[in-house]
Amino acid sequence: MISSNGESESHHAAPKAPLRVLMAWRPQSTSDEAAEVAAWVGRTEEIRVRAATVIPRAWEIQPGAQEFQEYRNWVMAETQACMNAALSALGKAGLPQGMLAEEDPAVVDIAPTETKVLIKAAADFEADFLLLGSHPAAPRSRFRMGSTADALLHCAPLPVLLAPRSPKLAKNGVTRVSCSYVDTVQSHEALRRASDLAARWNVPLRLVAFSPSGATMYPTNVPFDDNSDMMVEWREQALALLDRGRDRALSRHPNLKVQLDVGSGYGWSGAINALKWKKGDLLVMGSSELGQFNRVFIGPSTNQILRHSPVPVLVSPV
């Protein structure tokens, strides 16, 4: 590198250490959504942010080669330019200077791929979240995965915070934590993290379930009757599991304000857009059951929600 618990609410009275966020910064980035989300979280509570950039390396140049000194000079110049750009984006987004990491607020490495380097950088920083921006082809206020995000969402050992392109964010930070809950082991872990964050920030927790209409969770050629007895039963089942989720959250944080909501609509887009979203919403989701223990792994349903969510999403490892 070139440098520039599961307790109940009664045990959270001690002073909290600032959340630590490793922001992945790409030198060719065309927008600053990752920096904007970092600053948004920083308006919620005091945090520490380190920017990490990986410069792709196509091949090795041996020290004795004629081009080595020229290459070394380029590396040093590019490293400084990347660190300056990342710190400038954070400053422009409104992150206070005091919330940058005390040591090495920006780091740069040169490697063939980004994934392993970012995971190691997050571990070195003891990060609570790994923050990623969207692919530039994403629609406004939506997230699309690039190759690095895709890889990290299938192997990261820590929560991954995803910033939608050109996000609309509340000036006073996170004002509500929403949690996609389906009463599985994976969503239990997401609920634990979501309820802890809501209690930490003293904001409401909203448990949400999505009920895409149709006989499957994807659009079909043959319409399905949304008013059928089956759809009514699905909604009742969703409300029942959300009730169980509320009980879990309140057993962990008895003073938490918990809201329940079910989004029903045609396909995933319709179901997600049926809910009312605020500029202060953070959506927390669990990983797929196919993932390794203590690793993020997104499945088809998670991917659909990521594509259509209009707010930043935190994907929690199992």
Question: What is the predicted function of each stretch?
Answer:
Residues 2-13, 148-167, 225:
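Extended, non-globular alpha-helical segments
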Residues 129-151, 174, 282-308:
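Glycine-rich, Arg-bearing micro-motifs that act as flexible, cationic patches
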Residues 69-82, 227-240:
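A short acidic, glycine-rich active-site loop
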Residues 131-134, 159-166, 313-317:
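Short beta-strand elements of ligand-binding domains
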Residues 102-117, 261-270:
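Charged docking surfaces used in two-component/phosphorelay signaling
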Residues 4-70, 95-98, 102-103, 175-228, ...:
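Small/aliphatic-rich secondary-structure junction motif
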Residues 236, 262-273, 279-318:
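Protein-protein interaction modules outside structured cores
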Residues 121-127, 276-280:
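Glycine-rich phosphate-binding loop signature in dinucleotide/nucleotide-binding domains
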